[in-house]
Amino acid sequence: MAANPVFAQETFRFFRDLGKNNKKVWMDAHRDRYQAAVVQPFRRLLEEMAPVVLELDDRFDTTGRTGRNFSRINRDIRFAKDKTLYKTQMYLKFEQPQPGERASGQLYVGLSTNTVTAGFRVYSGPKRRESSLALVAEPRVQAETKWVSKQKQRLGRRYDSYWYTTEKGEWTKHEGWPVKPEDWKKIQGWIVRRKMAPGAATKSGFPKELARIFREVYPLLKFTSIP
């Protein structure tokens, strides 16, 4: 007998309803629904995926803490342009603790109102010069100038790639693969992902598909983030 799916359509309905009723009074009245539709399925997915990522590298953090493995539903509106109180998406992410809480690469999967995404991402964090992008990825790309092009050839047909720089203090998105070594002197983030319809997450084989994705993109994390 096939295993029960981790997620149901109720997860996506909850995010859509939250988007229409993004107020504390609504969220407080629907906490039980949030737990059943979002929190519990994501914790089950962590249990399913932890052995997979630990097989790739046993230094991955799989402790199940909010912030470390799970994104926060509450939005920090102090500095955000979007002043809505709650995010209409949730992420499960795996990364390896770095010295001084240095920003590092992640394997991740996210569900939102109408989309599922999964893959690899790395950001510079608040201090780029102290991030894995600056200390690990940039010098490696300068030493192996064809590495990104090889990853594009390996993954480009199945995965989307985009990256960010800052221009005049604003984040600027660049579609495609950062194949030029000079790109890595200013890159602030890089994402390589698969984008799927909600139905992908409601299938019993979803964890198996995630395992395949994580194995395929793990070399990106290893190259850009692990000293």
Residues covered by each model-derived region:
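A non-catalytic, amphipathic alpha-helix used as a structural packing/dimerization or gating element
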Residues: V25-R44, E48, R212, E216
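Aromatic- and glycine-enriched beta-alpha-beta binding-site module
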Residues: R75-R140
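A solvent-exposed interaction/effector surface
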Residues: Q153, E175-T202
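C-terminal edge-of-domain segments
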Residues: R193-P227
